[in-house]
Amino acid sequence: MLAHMPAARTFLQHPDPLTREIAEGYAGGSFLMDNGDGLRWYGVPGRALVPLTEDAGLHVARRMRRELKHFRPSVDLAFDEVIAGCRGHLPGSPERDGEWISDELVEIYQHLHTTGLAHSFEVWQGDELAGGVLGLALGGAFIAESKFHRLTNGSKAALIHLAEHLDRQGFALLDAQIQNPHLATLGVYEVTDKEYRRLLRRALALDVEL
């Protein structure tokens, strides 16, 4: 009988070499970016983490809480569209933070999506894609690579819905990588690299599914 393998170990020991390489890099605390000089591994001294609940520090203004009801969340329903939105390639996606996502990295994300490591989290208004988050799920850690919105508050709604979804699924960590003023309004906070790696190790040991 095969031994049960926690989700993170599934990718760290994956038969596909690329999936295994990427999983090992993220499990070690690094992340991929292309800042115009080729694809490289990066790390930052202060890692931005999103609280998963309001009790843990997630800030959801009363008006935003009311607006959330108008955004319908989903997982992996529009992966290619979310990548395009993050790159600013979708009509009406003014806010994006994925200009660093090169064509090569798009191909990697698409490959990782087929092996189950890369995911999209979307929010919709009716049949219209309002915003989304692109990321990797490894054990109980979700590493958010990029986000975008097409409708007002779309990226904010996506991140809040994602945090609450991860909490329900038993995840322990939502990593936003790099802090910015927009994230700070949601209660996103920074931890040192040493603390991040400690939290990441604990999250990787969890056997949860997105």
From Swiss-Prot:
Give the protein's biological function: Functions in the N-end rule pathway of protein degradation where it conjugates Leu, Phe and, less efficiently, Met from aminoacyl-tRNAs to the N-termini of proteins containing an N-terminal arginine or lysine.
Name of the molecule in the record: Leucyl/phenylalanyl-tRNA--protein transferase
Q: Which domain of life is it from?
A: Bacteria
**What gene is this protein translated from?**
aat
Which Pfam families does the protein's record reference? Leu_Phe_trans (PF03588)
Q: How far does the signal peptide extend, from start to end residue?
A: none
Q: Which species does the entry assign this protein to?
A: Deinococcus radiodurans (strain ATCC 13939 / DSM 20539 / JCM 16871 / CCUG 27074 / LMG 4051 / NBRC 15346 / NCIMB 9279 / VKM B-1422 / R1)
A molecular function annotated in GO for this UniProt entry is:
leucyl-tRNA--protein transferase activity
Matching entries from NCBIfam families are given as: aat
Q: Which terms does the UniProt entry file under GO BP?
A: protein catabolic process
